[in-house]
From Swiss-Prot:
NCBIfam families: PRK09177.1. Acts on guanine, xanthine and to a lesser extent hypoxanthine. Purine salvage pathway enzyme that catalyzes the transfer of the ribosyl-5-phosphate group from 5-phospho-alpha-D-ribose 1-diphosphate (PRPP) to the N9 position of the 6-oxopurines guanine and xanthine to form the corresponding ribonucleotides GMP (guanosine 5'-monophosphate) and XMP (xanthosine 5'-monophosphate), with the release of PPi. To a lesser extent, also acts on hypoxanthine. Belongs to the purine/pyrimidine phosphoribosyltransferase family. XGPT subfamily. Guanine binds at D95, I138. 5-phospho-alpha-D-ribose 1-diphosphate binds at R37, G38, D91, D92, L93, V94, D95, T96, G97, N98, T99. Its EC number is 2.4.2.-, 2.4.2.22. GMP binds at D95, T96, G97, N98, T99, W137, I138. This is Xanthine-guanine phosphoribosyltransferase. It catalyses: GMP + diphosphate = guanine + 5-phospho-alpha-D-ribose 1-diphosphate; XMP + diphosphate = xanthine + 5-phospho-alpha-D-ribose 1-diphosphate; IMP + diphosphate = hypoxanthine + 5-phospho-alpha-D-ribose 1-diphosphate. It comes from Haemophilus influenzae (strain ATCC 51907 / DSM 11121 / KW20 / Rd). One of its GO terms (cellular component) is plasma membrane.
Length: 155
């Protein structure tokens, strides 16, 4: 990936709250299925904003490092009735669409949303907030840490 898009906690919360607004009224939802790990963070915001307490997870591993997506491994699948009807499936990002296709097969009746979407996968989700170019790596706030940076005069 040649470009980077750095997301701060403030930006992330703002975007996740905007996504929550689009999911109102909350009474239509039975719960949330968070795609682990990236979907855990927006799931917490959605749960708070929509007043939902029933949160499940689906654990799918696909990224092995910043540049390489590998074969999908379903490590855990939430057991919900009726193909996920009445549930929101949430992930931080839809990228190539590989994970999204697997999710769609597992929960065909759920509402599938992400905070960010790249062109190759955008059509696979029901809603998202921010368009990201395909060749851009997203640096999410939970993957970053604060470190000391020396003054320019000391370099």
């Amino acid at each position: 990936m040649s470009e980077k898009y750095v997301v701060t906690w403030d930006m992330f919360q703002m975007h996740a709250r905007r996504l929550s607004e689009r999911l109102l009224p909350a009474s239509q939802w039975k719960g949330i299925i968070a795609v682990s790990r990236g979907g855990l963070f927006p799931a917490a915001v959605l749960a708070r904003e929509l007043g939902l307490r029933h949160i499940e997870t689906v654990c799918i591993a696909s990224y092995h490092d910043h540049n390489n997506q590998g074969e999908l491994q379903v490590l855990h699948a939430a057991q919900v009735p009726n193909g996920g009807e009445g549930f929101i499936v949430v992930d931080d990002l839809v990228d190539t669409g590989n994970t999204a296709r697997a999710i769609r097969q597992m929960y065909p009746n759920a509402k599938f949303v992400t905070v960010f979407a790249k062109p190759a996968g955008a059509e696979l989700v029901d809603d998202y907030v921010i368009d990201i170019p395909q060749n851009t790596w997203i640096e999410q706030p939970w993957d970053l840490g604060l470190t000391f940076v020396p003054p320019l005069s000391r370099k």
